[in-house]
Amino acid sequence: MELGVLSLGDLQRDQRTGRRHRPVDRMAEILGYAVLADQLGLDVFAIGEHHSAEFFTSSPAVVLAATAARTARIRLTSATTLRGVADPVRVYEDFASLDVISRGRAE
């Protein structure tokens, strides 16, 4: 069995103020989850791709590259990749580069 963390990169509303979190703050929070998951020995961290105002993760490979720079062991994957939005060759190349950056941890 494998255990991991998945984030869709949603911009949640602050329960106290009702305002959406800023993308920069939410990114720091999600990267923190990935670091903690790595430290706790979880197997995989996944991020989703979205293109709307409620989400900030339009490029999973970029977010996962930032994750790779902060983690040592956890495997990195995209929870969703929208094939209709991106050139398939470009997606392959981005994840091949991520695999090099992460020293073989990209899936």
Residue ranges of model-derived segments:
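N-terminal beta1-alpha1-beta2 module of alpha/beta enzyme domains
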Residues: 1-77
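Flexible, glycine-rich active-site loops centered on histidine and acidic residues
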Residues: 2-23, 84-107
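Acidic, glycine-rich active-site loops and adjacent beta-strand->loop/helix elements
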Residues: 50-53, 80-89
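A short, GP-enriched loop/loop-strand-helix hinge that lies immediately N-terminal to
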Residues: 75-81, 107
